[in-house]
Amino acid sequence: MRGFGLVVLFFVSLVVAAIAMFPLSQALNLMGAKSKGLAYERAYGTIWSGALDQANYIGQPLGRVSFASRPLSLLSGALSVDFRISGQTADGRGQARFGMGGVEIANTTADVNVQNINNLDARLRQSPSTLNISIKSLKLSYAGACRGGRSDIRTDLLTSVGRQWRWQGPAMTGELVCVDERPSFDMRNEGGADQITAQMTLNDRGGYLAQAEVRTQNSDVIQALRALGFESRGGAFVYEKQSVGVSQAAARPAGRVEEINYED
């Protein structure tokens, strides 16, 4: 029986090794990655450890994306993969854990160059600014549903954009939360006399719904808000903008929403 067990273990090892050595480029072709919005100049390595050069997701350049699996993590019932993104839009690294119930993004940090986010309102990209993301845990189903998480985010977007209107905009801080099973950046101002809240909810097509509300009596701030597309409504200045991503959304949020469609 011991000899039979060794034979079984040998063949199982061969199967695992064969799967691990499967070329990344062929795996992406079988998955139809390009039809789902993922483009790249070249794929290296295997599905176990590899990289993509000049990666692009739904029209957004990512640069080089690399990953390496941790074989021993399988003993815990989940496969852990270390990843790195390096490009003009973002520089970050972290870990993804693939288990029976879905994916967990953990121990991830990234600095995002807001000026290079193609889908974002051009008025918010006129001055250089950064979005700093620190994800302790973000749980997603394999269908893409957001299940919860813990994170910290910070941006100097308003500080950068406000300078041209003599407004020292505050830093915005917050967290990445789940809204209707979708990841959402929920932020508020850090200090200052004005009351500012902002939320950007992502969809599974690479689009988003951005909403913000500002309460202020500062004339310089009001001038800046109007130039950025805010509307006076109920004693506050309100901003809403939607990018539906790669396909038209069946339903649209109530209110005045500007829509951008980035279909290929």
Segments and roles (model prediction):
Residues 2-23:
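Hydrophobic membrane-insertion alpha-helices, especially the h-region
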Residues 4-7, 33, 167-264:
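Extended terminal
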Residues 24-45:
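Alpha-helical transmembrane signal-anchor/signal-peptide segments
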Residues 28-35, 57-59, 82-87, 161-168, ...:
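Short, solvent-exposed secondary-structure boundary motifs
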Residues 68-72, 97-101, 143, 177, ...:
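Short beta-strand micro-motifs enriched in acidic
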Residues 81, 149-151, 210:
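Transmembrane beta-strands of outer-membrane beta-barrel proteins
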Residues 127, 132-199:
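Solvent-exposed beta-strand/coil patches in large extracellular/periplasmic or lumenal scaffold regions
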